[in-house]
Amino acid sequence: MEVFTFRKKIKINLIMEVGTLTMNVNETAEEYIDQIPMWARKKNSLEDIRRFLYEMGEPDESMKIFHVAGTNGKGSVCAFLQSALINTGYRVGTFTSPHLIDIKERFCINGKMVSEDTFFRSCERVKELSQRMMEKGFCHPSYFEFLFYMAMDMFCQAEVDYVILETGLGGRLDTTNVIRHPLVSIITSISLDHTEYLGDTIEKIAWEKAGIIKEGVPVVFDGNDISASAVIKSRAKELLVSFDQVDKQDYRIINTNDIGFCAQFLDTNGKNHELMIPSHGEYQVMNALLSFRALEAAGLGAIKSIKEGFSNMQWPARMEEVMPGVFLDGAHNPAGIEAFLEAALKLCQTRQKKADIMFSAVSDKDYSLMIKKVANTLPLYHVAVAHIDSERGLKTEILLKEFQEVCGSQVKGFSSVEEALSFLLHERDEDRLIFCVGSLYLMGEIKTVLRRNKYDGF
């Protein structure tokens, strides 16, 4: 294996072909990546991305890849697959997005975030690749393209047995769809989100997601939405691909406890299996079942190892109890909010408690509908809203007005997430649960605050 010299500081002498952005400074790798516009004006086509991979030696061609698309549940499916494969004894690379706190969260090897050393070395290699390709007339990679190349590089260097690859946006034109021979294509639940890019109907969005389906590659998909299922099945039949439609009829909840759900699954042969799902959200049962069927489709049916792996699955900000009675859920669209509310309401009813809510959202989401759903579903006591530290974040005044119009509970606005969290933690008592929801940016800020250990003893 080639040995590269590690330099934590990377010399950048590059004029990017994106707007008029010019950089000629010494920066760390993360600073360099952060200055790449997420939505480059000149994005590389899939054919061009293939050329980048060819220049890298086409590392993806020798990888066994699970390719995951969908609106909600992608990250959780990746986490279930990762946990099961690691427990079976395989070395696994996982590429997901977005990150909550640290950009390195997007790259995991055997369930652990890559080291700073690994991250910087890979960034340097991809930066040098980008410079070579620009000299040949290609555009500098977009933010997500750059991270995708880093993932392929890291997983190649780590000599992983399997790769779990989550799409960034959509499927058909997504950067990750450059891969040609995945083991299985997986499509999670589909709902209205990113409509400005993917279309304004379920059918249009499903068509974009179904773009990851490839000839000769089995597809496993969430079949609970009739409209989405029809589109996915049509595409699979067009390509003569075997498909496995999974829905709520394929499992039943046996019991629940403080850890999560015990569910009974049907495998593709109609045989029952009992699995423990460590989550307070029933929506994770469907994600676990999708993962189970995908492993079957890949010929990896070591049931005992899968069961143990699933029972150890961890995925942040999905009905995550970060301290007793305090839950984080990254739901950020109406369908995700509905799944969250189903789980939160069951917790309130089971524990006979009311709910305190911290809510924030970004401006390009259907925040008004999400707020109405929250206000009309949960037995609310306190509602705290705050502006998240993002250009896309809604102003506190807008959030406050929206909640006040539909909610009779005590609604308070705060200038920061930390102030809102501090208020709820100071005011909480044994009769209420605290739920934080509405945006993954919000989850990241809360986790950053909690990391400072300011709230020990509350």
Q: Which residues fall in each region the model found?
A:
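Active-site-proximal loop/hinge segments that shape catalytic or ion-binding/gating pockets
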Residues: 439
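Acidic, Mg2+-coordinating active-site environments of NTP-dependent enzymes
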Residues: 10, 134-136, 158-166, 182-274, ...
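C-terminal helical cap/extension that packs against the catalytic core
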Residues: 225-240, 327, 371-433
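Short functional linear segments
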Residues: 4, 13-70, 77-90, 95, ...
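Beta-strand->loop->alpha-helix junctions that form or flank phosphate-binding loops
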Residues: 222-223, 237-257, 276-282, 305-313, ...
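ATP-dependent carboxylate-amine ligase catalytic core
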Residues: 53, 58-61, 87-180, 196-198, ...
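Short, high-confidence coil segments that cap the C-terminus of an alpha-helix
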Residues: 158-161, 352, 429-431
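Nucleotide phosphate-binding/pyrophosphate-handling subdomain across enzymes
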Residues: 162-165, 173-186, 190-194, 204, ...
